[in-house]
């Protein structure tokens, strides 16, 4: 294998590692899990409207328990009302996805992605059950607000809220630019 081929392979592997290793996952496990408390504005860089956390064992046999993917807590929407997750500083973010489970009865959940008051994205409806979490992956970039609404006036549970860290995107971009420069130099 030629030296140039080795460099290309190493560069591609580095770019791939940046994408995989640096997803920011919000687990909610560093919060108290007291269902009477809201998630504080600014938590993990977001403002959480109409949302709290609850411990997995607060309601045995519920979707809160079934929907806990990691640790002890899940986030949920108070009283089954629509919830929003907005960037605390007003900047854009990318929402990869999260695990969702219905707390009490099967229901549907939908999403909208907004930026500066303009709707950029809207999802179809996803069915949530009470017995197991469903991974919902949207991969929406450039939003500053995520609106989550559901068909039933009962709560849903959310865990593993995943957003890529800006640093990982910059590393990938740097790797790609480096690969392009190396290929141009080799062709010259």
Predicted feature locations:
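N-terminal hydrophobic or amphipathic segments with adjacent small-residue motifs
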Residues: 5, 17, 111, 167-172
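Bacterial N-terminal signal peptides that target proteins for export
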Residues: 2-10
